[in-house]
């Protein structure tokens, strides 16, 4: 039996409260004779010591005779692909065709203090997890690629949109997970985009370093044990981009505890009596690495809105995350420049007219597609159109008012308004009616003409 040496390693976990040194390490100038290798006398001596025979022909040792390749000038490329159908592999070589990582050893290096039943259960759990992860990853990736290829055409996109309406009407018990059929749905939510946050780029910020101020006080130890490492100071912290010697990084600024409480009071109540400006002090520098999401929907921020009285109105608003950024503590590499900002004074003010207009327009134009001046001109045009419509409506209401005055006057004279209106309309029609036309063949003689005819 093979004997394996196992060492017992005890890992001591403790906090190191020592801060980093406030000064960079001392740079020592070590003489290095690098320049002598570029001198011409050194190269000449090197050539004399080591003679390398190089005999090259016209083709530099690589003769190319394309005429010897059959079918090359006719475009036949079958000579580039070798025929492997007639090759018989040796049984020993067939083992090389197995997929790497398909089967491996389940032996785990464990310390001698672990019990055997724990080791066996861990081996079985690790094997099952590897298989499930591999199957899930391959299946989900294949489904995503297949769906992406199928949705490249517009008719397929319309079909997918219509299918989404059918799925919403489908009973909850009939829903199935595409890759995990054992899961059963419990409740359904309406997934909708968060239009109020559509015009803003959101970043997922992850700090790899501990931001808590470590100390040996009793309160800090209690907060560390309870998990309250961050105080109110970090809730109102500021990031400022900085640069030094061609390198860019982020500077982190924090206020005091009292200032943080005053800032929150000022934000919650604009009329709060606080001392401005608020002073921020430099706390730490961070190196940032950013990964921009290619598709735009790799990371989503979900906001749940629950309605207990109407469960069908439950909504989940999603906001796409533009990029993920990781902040790591920046170590001191060079002397601190005199241009570094040690503190920031912050003052809060009310919104001006343009900013308030932008805030109001953001409710209807979340993407910021319209210009402020153009929007103001449109609003003025709408107001002028509304004014003209109001004038037309007022002119239409004037005859109605005169009609009411006429009716009231007729009632005082004892005449019914309906009969008087009919008489007025009849007289007006007679006065305004044209005379009947006179035909030429049916003209009647006047009385003078009749007397003359009788005397004759």
Swiss-Prot record:
Region (Disordered) spans which residues?
A: 382-456
Spell out the InterPro entries in the cross-references.
Answer: RNA_pol_II-assoc_Paf1
Report the residues modified as Phosphoserine. 388
PANTHER family in the record: RNA POLYMERASE II-ASSOCIATED FACTOR 1 HOMOLOG (PTHR23188:SF12)
Asked if the Swiss-Prot or TrEMBL record annotates the protein with the keyword Cytoplasm, the reply is yes
GO BP annotations listed = heterochromatin boundary formation; transcription elongation by RNA polymerase II
Keyword Transport on entry: no
Q: What is its main location?
A: cytoplasm
User: Compositional bias (Polar residues) spans?
Assistant: 408-433, 441-456
UniProt subcellular location = Cytoplasm; Nucleus
Bias type Basic and acidic residues, positions = 396-406
GO MF entries: chromatin binding; RNA polymerase II complex binding
- Which protein family is named in the record? Belongs to the PAF1 family.
- Give the record's keywords alphabetically: Cytoplasm, Nucleus, Phosphoprotein
- Spell out the protein name for this chain: RNA polymerase II-associated protein 1 homolog
Q: Name one Pfam family in it.
A: Paf1
Any Gene Ontology CC annotation? nucleus
């Amino acid at each position: 039996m093979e004997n394996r040496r196992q060492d017992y390693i005890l890992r001591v976990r403790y906090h190191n409260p020592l801060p980093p040194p406030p000064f960079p390490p001392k740079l020592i100038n070590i003489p290095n004779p690098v320049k002598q290798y570029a001198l011409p006398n050194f190269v000449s001596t090197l050539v004399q010591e080591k003679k390398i025979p190089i005999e090259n022909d016209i083709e530099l040792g690589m003769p190319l005779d394309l005429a010897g390749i059959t079918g090359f000038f006719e475009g036949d490329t079958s000579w580039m692909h070798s025929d492997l159908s007639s090759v018989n592999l040796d049984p020993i070589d067939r083992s090389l065709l197995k997929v790497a990582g398909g089967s491996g050893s389940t032996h785990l290096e464990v310390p001698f203090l672990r019990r055997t039943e724990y080791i066996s259960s861990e081996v079985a759990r690790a094997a099952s997890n590897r298989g499930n992860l591999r199957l899930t990853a391959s299946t989900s990736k294949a489904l995503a690629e297949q769906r992406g290829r199928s949705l490249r055409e517009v008719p397929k996109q319309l079909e997918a949109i219509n299918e989404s309406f059918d799925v919403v009407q489908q009973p909850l018990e009939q829903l199935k997970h595409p890759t995990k059929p054992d899961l059963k749905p419990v409740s359904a939510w309406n997934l909708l985009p968060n239009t109020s946050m559509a015009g803003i780029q959101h970043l997922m910020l992850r700090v790899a370093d501990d931001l808590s101020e470590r100390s040996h006080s009793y309160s800090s130890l209690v907060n560390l044990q309870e998990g309250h490492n961050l105080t109110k100071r970090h809730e109102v912290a500021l990031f400022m981009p900085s640069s030094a010697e061609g390198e860019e990084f982020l500077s982190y600024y924090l206020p005091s505890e009292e200032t943080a409480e005053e800032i929150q009071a000022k934000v919650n109540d604009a009329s709060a009596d606080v001392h401005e400006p608020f002073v921020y002090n430099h706390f730490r520098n961070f190196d940032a690495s950013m990964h921009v999401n290619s598709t735009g929907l790799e990371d989503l921020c979900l906001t749940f809105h629950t309605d207990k009285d109407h469960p069908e109105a439950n909504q989940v608003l999603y906001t796409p995350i533009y990029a993920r950024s990781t902040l790591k503590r920046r170590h001191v590499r060079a002397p601190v420049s005199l241009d570094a900002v040690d503190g920031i004074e912050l003052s809060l003010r009310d919104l001006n007219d343009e900013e308030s207009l932008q805030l109001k327009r953001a409710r209807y134009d979340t993407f910021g597609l319209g210009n402020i001046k153009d929007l103001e001109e449109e609003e003025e045009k709408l107001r002028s159109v509304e004014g003209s419509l109001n004038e037309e409506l007022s002119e239409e209401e004037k005859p109605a008012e005169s009609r009411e005055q006429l009716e009231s006057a007729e009632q005082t004279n004892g005449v019914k308004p309906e009969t008087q209106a009919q008489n007025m309309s009849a007289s007006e029609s007679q006065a305004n009616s044209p005379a009947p036309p006179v035909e030429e063949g049916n003209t009647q003689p006047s009385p003078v003409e009749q007397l003359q005819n009788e005397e004759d």
